[in-house]
Amino acid sequence: MSTDSEMSEDMTLWEVLNEMRLEEELCDVVLRVDEVEFKVHKIILCANSPYFRSLFIRWSSLDQKVYTMTTVSPDIMAIIIHYIYTQEIRVTTDNVQAVLVMADYLLMRDLVHDCYDFLKAHLSPENCLGIWQYADTYSFRKLQDWAYSYTLRHFEDVVRSPSSEFLELNEEQLGGILERDELNVKQEKTAFEALIMWVEHEPDIRIQHIANLLLKVRLALIDLEYFLENIKTHPLVSSSWECQPIILRTLKAMFYINEFAHNTGYPDPLARPRLPYSILFAVGGFSRRSATNIVETYNSRMDTWKCISSREESVRAYHGTVFLDGFVYVIGGFDGTECFKSVCKFNPLDRTWNEVSPMTSRRCYVSVAILDGYIYAMGGFNGRERLNTAERYQPSTNQWSLIPSMHEVRSDASATTLLGKIYICGGFNGDECLFTAECFDPRYNQWTQIERMHVRRSGVGVIALNNQVSAMGGFDGAQRLQCLEAYNPRTNSWRMLASMFNPRSNFGVEVMDGRLYVVGGYSTEGTTSNCEYYDEESKDWFDVQDMNVFRSALSCCVISGLPNITDYTIAYDDFL
């Protein structure tokens, strides 16, 4: 038995109660699980579980001392009791599902939520389908929705994972996934290939479902050559008489899309674009010789731009834009008269703008990046001189603080984050366009110069892609550029890649769905609305739909997973 002196004054109430349990002090009830007995206190269990409260008060006599629990193992019961007495959860990926079932049975709401959070944090392509089906079995609706949304979002990885349970889905479950607008596939052929993989797992049984499932695939959005070579002639498809009308419908839809050069407006589910998981935001810039507050969003699934401008936001050009912790931050810039130190943030859920703490310096032609929860603003022009100073913003404290200055003065540069460092490249120092570059390592709080680019670039676009720093476009002092080069941090070297279709400077740049997008800017003919993207796999550039507005000096960011994604896309049904 513990003495009062042994109970430290520093012990919390929970620690005291747990020690009393372990020492079997004042225990007044025994829970028997198989051959294991747990001596506990009725009042503590009643305070944490409505089930135990009813068991001890309503469903048994007051003098009953031993209760047999038949729906749980001793190991899980030990975890439950430890949680009741300490509020500490001891779950692992191996036992969390059993703990959750028992916590739900005991009506322990807080423990249920803790298990939910644990499972949500550990969702993966390998286990999401299993968790979805488990949650469905036990009617854990919130967990079921999380797992299902994860499956839709990471569908390509789920299908590729050899340890996922994709091939064990039934026809109804697979059909439900394939028909969802939210299914996140970069190319629709992925959905078809997943369907074929599923059928081929048990062809004799599943071939009867192929026509019904084929209707769930947006076949008319697939490349015609691939469709003719891999779908129309596929043995499982060509041998099914039920599939032949679907093939004809698809070809008819493809003909319409080809004739009108777009997939909008054709009233067939086979041609219905899916909703994007990510949206590209293009913010502000110069248009018609003046700064603008225009915001457009790009939907890669429909290849369309939508204007979502708000009068609440001031006009800005030569600013920076980032997305962090649920907000779009617009940093610094120029309104045609004044260089800004102000910073505004946009909430994409309710579409409201609010100002946050301003920077320590005015900065237009500013370079921005995010790293480890901070927003970095570097270089720029304050209305009098070009800057080499840099600072960072912490949203939780709403404060900016200076970091060491860069080695060189830079305005009109561009920055990105890669492997825990910030890279800034090119720019203009007031006398010449720069081909120098440097990186900031927050671990050592210092800047380090890296190998120079092959080309001088002011108004350059810089972005991380495939573990390299890509720098493209810009102005070299004589002409706008269309060349692209990539920096490898391991070798400290640059190499030239495929050039853009169009030369441009002062444009927006972002990576979305593994593609490098360049948006608007200043070209050889003036301000442009032209957009294109670079595909890392093919090493080629491709045209995309022009913006609605000609703009240069704009800035871009990407937002993924918005629950109100339809607010930022043109509804397909609007074209019908």
Tell what function each PLM region has.
Residues 19-127, 164, 170-202:
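Canonical BTB/POZ domain core
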Residues 1-10:
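Cytosolic, low-complexity regulatory segments enriched in Ser/Pro/Gly with interspersed Lys/Arg
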